[in-house]
């Protein structure tokens, strides 16, 4: 019998246990009774229970689930409604048909909160009730109606039902989704609307052992698989589950055993609904005023009630689907047992042909077992589930397939990498193409032997292999390119070093012109594509890197070859060339101070004239050498050298400045000190030579020693020695070595005299200090000996 307009239920709210003011509660209205009659008085009820101007400011929420699972209680606790709930002492159907109620307030973590939007809640008769038995017609139509008219469909399910087929109402949901797709899928295509329904999966009696995320993953996977198995019209085949539905989850503790945690879970869910407003999205709304929605709901029920297609699929097909799923699961478990036996350990070097044959045998055995048990059921279902079994087996075999394919690729890639290194850059691009082509062909041939005639795709393997090859080649290209750059820089450095060393032999105004010309002769020849198959960008970067490093080498080599110590030594050598040797390269012997002072001034000037040349790299035209790159820039050093010293940022650098002014002053001071010492030493020898023995003394000696002189001449031995001595003096004079010989003889005699005086002092004088020092030395030696013995 159709309900009269505005007729309300007169149920008690005492069983709902809703902690709100009873005056705020509104009785629910039955919009569809158990006889499938639609109540046309919905709009009057809504106008009576809700604010005057509802308009589009409303949300429709419905609940779906098995009978006696606490759906009505859940709605009452969430939305403070007054739906009838089950008497726990007598488990029987409470909700009959579909009921609608207005939510006055919701219970959030902040307390009772009035929603900014009007919330209307539908309580749908539970499924799988004994009152209806096998008559599932109303269950399907009621579920389809709730799905078609609601923004949020709460699927009430116990934790223990997750993963089940019948327990989780998957069969009914599949039927509802299929019919919903056929009824409303064309509308989505024609209007291109983005309307969706949110499936809010509330997991009841969650004990916390299995994480909510894991349960959600299982349930979502079941929904996706179920959608994939729907019998879709051809024009709707491309539509996905996500085109029609969004899914979210919320877990609640046991209502009786954990009442406090249950209440807190209810409050958190209400927070999601009305506080954060995360569950109400514009695309869920039907985008019609409330009076339009009531008309829409009535016409939806009319279409659902009169459409004969809702009687499909038949129970036979449902049974076939269920049984074939059971057979698939059983056969697949048997396959897994064989799989574990054969592939418990991974063979490091398998025979791919034998492995492919084993794959085929295992799969064929599973197909034969499935065919023997499932072929008697509906042919379409049987073939569909056989495809599912094929997919499951292939997916499992793909694991072993991928492992062996990866091992093969890794082994061949290692050899490929060694072959690339062995090339040492010779014909690199050509050889890389040859080696990489051979590698891909080898992998393709070997892996195809176990691919089950292409059922196990090689595309991912070959794609990954190609990427690995490209990565290895790119890495080796960089190594070879860097090697070319470094070798070229080293060659340039050697050439530059030779050029600078040559110029240091006789620096002049064109010294740095010659060095720069030699540098640029090598510097400007570097370039080309290098024969590595690298891109033009990489080649250009290599050229820039070479040029930057070349200028760095120019700076480093010049500072290495022209340091303070080496510059001082060079100045001293140039001074000695003029001061100690004559133009023929023979040692000079100074006989007077005038000659000494003149030569000293010339030698000093000769040495110092190269000081400004070697301390600052300046060309003949007066301009300083400026590099093409600022080699002191930290960013450039980071880019081309891979790092830089932070302390260098605090110093001001000038590329052309080899020796700073301070260092130059230090070198000049040391040089003057050294040459002045040489001047004084040479001058002292002249004075000693002049003041040693007057010439007239030799005349007196000759007169007074005439008799002795004659005795020497008459003695053959003495005469022979005189002849030898005279000849020696003549030869030295003839060769121009007499003066140096006299200097050497004089210095030798001085040393002999000094040593003789020292020995004579030791013998004749009782020097206590000397004796003490000797005793100390002896004592020290003894201690050292004792320490060595220890």
UniProtKB/Swiss-Prot annotation:
Membrane topology reported for the UniProt record: Multi-pass membrane protein
Q: Which residues lie on this side of the membrane: Cytoplasmic?
A: 1-692, 738-790
Xref: Pfam families:
RHD3_GTPase, Sey1_3HB
State the EC number(s).
3.6.5.-
Chain positions recorded as GTP binding sites? 65-72
Lumenal-facing ranges: 714-716
Which CDD domains does the entry mention?
A: GBP (cd01851)
Cellular localization per UniProt: Endoplasmic reticulum membrane
Q: Name one GO molecular function term.
A: GTPase activity
PROSITE patterns membership: G_GB1_RHD3 (PS51715)
Q: Where are the transmembrane segments?
A: 693-713, 717-737
Indicate whether Endoplasmic reticulum appears among the record's keywords. yes
Q: Which GO terms describe its biological process?
A: endoplasmic reticulum inheritance; endoplasmic reticulum membrane fusion; hexose transmembrane transport
What GO CC annotations are associated with the protein? cortical endoplasmic reticulum; endoplasmic reticulum; endoplasmic reticulum membrane
Which protein, by its recorded name, is this? Protein SEY1
State the species of origin. Candida albicans (strain SC5314 / ATCC MYA-2876)
Per UniProt, what is the name of the gene that codes for the protein in this document?
Answer: SEY1
């Amino acid at each position: 019998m159709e309900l009269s307009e505005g007729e309300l239920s007169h149920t008690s709210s005492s069983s709902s246990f809703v902690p709100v003011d009873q005056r705020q509660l509104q009785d629910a209205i039955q919009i569809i009774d158990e006889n499938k009659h639609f109540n046309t008085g919905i709009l009057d009820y809504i106008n009576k229970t809700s604010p005057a101007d509802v308009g589009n400011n409303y949300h429709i929420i419905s609940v779906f689930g098995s009978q006696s699972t606490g759906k009505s209680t859940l709605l009452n606790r969430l939305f403070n409604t007054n739906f009838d709930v089950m008497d726990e002492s007598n488990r029987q159907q409470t909700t009959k048909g579909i009921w609608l109620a207005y939510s006055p307030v919701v219970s959030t973590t902040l307390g009772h909160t009035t929603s900014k939007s009007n919330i209307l809640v539908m309580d749908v008769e539970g499924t799988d009730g004994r009152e209806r038995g096998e008559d599932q017609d109303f269950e399907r139509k009621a579920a389809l109606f709730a799905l078609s008219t609601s923004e949020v469909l709460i699927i009430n399910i116990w934790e223990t039902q997750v993963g089940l087929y019948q327990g989780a109402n998957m069969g009914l949901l599949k039927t509802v989704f299929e019919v919903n797709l056929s009824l409303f899928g064309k509308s989505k295509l024609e209007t291109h609307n983005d309307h969706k329904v949110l499936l809010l999966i509330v997991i009841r009696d969650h004990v916390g052992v299995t994480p909510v995320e894991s349960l959600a993953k299982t349930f979502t996977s079941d929904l996706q698989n179920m959608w994939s198995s729907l019998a879709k019209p051809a024009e709707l085949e491309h539509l996905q589950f996500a085109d029609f539905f969004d899914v979210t989850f919320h877990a609640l503790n046991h209502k009786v055993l954990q009442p406090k945690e249950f209440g807190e879970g209810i409050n958190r869910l209400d927070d999601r609904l009305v506080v954060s407003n995360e569950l109400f999205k514009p695309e869920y709304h039907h985008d019609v005023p409330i009076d339009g929605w009531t008309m829409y709901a009535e016409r939806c029920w009319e279409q659902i009630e009169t459409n004969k297609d809702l009687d499909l699929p038949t129970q036979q097909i449902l049974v076939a689907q269920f049984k074939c799923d059971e057979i698939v699961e059983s056969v697949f478990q048997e396959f897994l047992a064989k799989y574990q036996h054969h592939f418990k350990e991974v063979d490091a070097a398998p025979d791919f042909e034998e492995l492919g044959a084993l794959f085929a045998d295992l799969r064929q055995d599973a197909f034969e077992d499935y065919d023997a048990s499932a072929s008697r059921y509906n042919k379409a279902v049987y073939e569909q589930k056989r495809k599912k079994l094929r997919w499951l087996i292939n997916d499992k075999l793909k694991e072993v397939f991928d492992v062996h394919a990866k091992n093969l690729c890794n082994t061949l890639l290692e050899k490929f990498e060694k072959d690339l290194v062995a090339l040492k850059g010779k014909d690199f691009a050509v050889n890389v193409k040859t080696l990489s082509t051979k590698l891909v062909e080898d992998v393709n041939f070997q892996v195809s032997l176990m691919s089950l005639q292409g059922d196990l795709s090689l595309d991912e393997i070959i794609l990954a292999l190609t990427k690995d090859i490209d990565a290895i080649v790119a890495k080796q290209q960089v190594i070879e390119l860097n090697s070319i750059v470094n070798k070229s820089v080293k060659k340039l450095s050697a050439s530059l070093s030779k050029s600078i060393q040559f110029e240091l032999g006789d620096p002049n105004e064109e010294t740095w012109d010659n060095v720069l010309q030699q540098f640029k002769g090598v510097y400007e020849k570097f370039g080309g594509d290098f024969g590595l198959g690298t891109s033009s960008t990489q080649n250009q970067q290599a050229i820039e890197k070479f040029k930057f490093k070349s200028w760095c080498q120019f700076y480093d080599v010049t500072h290495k070859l022209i340091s303070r110590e080496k510059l001082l030594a060079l100045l001293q050598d140039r001074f000695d060339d003029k001061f100690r040797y004559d133009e023929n390269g023979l040692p000079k012997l100074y006989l007077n101070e005038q000659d000494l002072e003149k030569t000293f001034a010339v030698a000093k000037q000769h040495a110092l004239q190269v000081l400004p040349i070697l301390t600052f790299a300046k060309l003949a035209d007066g301009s300083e050498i400026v590099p093409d790159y600022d080699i002191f820039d930290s960013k450039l050093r980071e880019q081309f050298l891979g790092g830089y010293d932070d302390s260098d940022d605090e110093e001001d650098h000038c590329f052309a400045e080899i020796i700073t002014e301070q260092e130059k002053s230090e070198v000049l001071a040391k040089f003057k000190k050294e040459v002045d010492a040489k001047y004084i030493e040479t001058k002292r020898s002249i004075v000693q030579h002049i003041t040693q023995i007057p010439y007239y003394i030799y005349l007196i000696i000759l007169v007074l020693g005439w008799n002795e002189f004659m005795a020497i001449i008459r003695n053959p031995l003495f005469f022979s020695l005189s002849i030898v001595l005279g000849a020696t003096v003549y030869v030295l004079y003839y060769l121009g070595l007499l003066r140096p010989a006299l200097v050497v003889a004089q210095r030798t005699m001085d040393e002999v005299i000094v040593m003789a005086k020292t020995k004579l002092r030791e013998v004749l004088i009782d020097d206590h200090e000397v004796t003490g020092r000797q005793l100390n030395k002896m004592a020290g030696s003894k201690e050292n000996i004792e320490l060595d013995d220890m």
